[in-house]
A protein has these predicted regions:
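Aromatic-rich, lipid-facing transmembrane alpha helices and their immediate juxtamembrane interface loops
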Residues: 1-186
């Protein structure tokens, strides 16, 4: 290896890491109680969402949820790559993020906030309360249970990120709704 690893060397390291991750997942995670909890968290919230989501506003809710999901997955991937945190267990071995939270829990909870708190003021305060619950109650609990390890990250940073992510997502959806409304009235 020269001063910097070559693309081939980086590809080989990535291959070895993926192989090790799969071997660990098969030997340690798959079928464990923590794995089953994550499977349930990946599936069950969708039933809750289906029951409580206002189907008359499905397009806005789905757009909002997808935007939150994109933010969550992107930020989670970035934090993992920068070694800010680590997930010792996940539903699928190839994903280094907490799939159940990224694809289900956060988008669904935020979508329900968007639906039930329609004004900016009510949404903001509901978002602050939810961010506090996620950051200072749920995250420490999942650290204690071994689902999540903080490396160079804090619960306060999570708190701020949840709030910014929710506000940006709402702003984007409202911006699209305003554009649509302006262009639909002759």
């Amino acid at each position: 290896m020269g001063l910097h690893p070559s693309n081939e060397e980086l590809a080989e390291m990535a291959r070895l890491l993926t192989k090790a991750r799969i071997e660990h997942w098969v030997g340690e995670d798959f079928g464990s109680w923590r794995w089953w909890v994550l499977v349930m968290l990946l599936i069950m919230p969708w039933f809750i969402w289906y029951k409580f989501a206002n189907k008359k506003h499905l397009r806005d809710l789905a757009l909002f949820g997808m935007i939150v999901m994109v933010f969550t997955i992107t930020l989670d991937e970035l934090g993992f790559i920068l070694s800010l945190w680590h997930y010792p267990v996940d539903v699928i071995a190839m994903f280094p993020r907490l799939t159940s939270v990224d694809y289900t829990v956060v988008p669904i909870v935020f979508t329900l906030l968007y639906q039930y708190f329609p004004t900016w003021r009510s949404f903001f305060w509901a978002l602050v309360a939810t961010a506090a619950i996620f950051s200072f109650i749920i995250e420490p609990l999942i650290v204690l249970m071994g689902f999540y390890q903080l490396l160079k990250w804090t619960y306060w940073a999570s708190f701020i990120v949840y709030i910014i992510m929710g506000l940006l997502s709402r702003w984007i959806v409202r911006m699209f709704a305003d554009i649509e409304q302006k262009n639909s009235n002759p």
